[in-house]
Amino acid sequence: MGAGPYRLLDTRYGIDAPAKRVGAGGTLAVKVAGIGGIPLGATSVLVNLTGTGPTATTHLTAFGAGSLPGVMNLNLATGETRTVLAVIPLDSNGYIHIHNANGSVNVIADLEGSFG
């Protein structure tokens, strides 16, 4: 488990994504392998995932490849800020994907380490 801490994403300020909120049904693809000390061969990462200021009750789901899984990582009520530590698999190109269900929300992802 190397690397970290490193800010991978912050939609409030345009870090690795446009400086705008993630809309309902929106999914961000975030490059991780080779970033912030993560080796290109990493298979998963430990990420501190934060949602802040949602306009509706929502949930964030972080995942690797394939279709959206049926589980969520972080539940948020309107206007609140919450954080969760999650192990997220990387897709074959070294990305993680973060999906917002409802309303719009700012998303922050801080890398804490990697596996594999």
Feature names for model-found ranges:
Residues M1-G116:
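Short edge beta-strands and adjacent beta->alpha junctions
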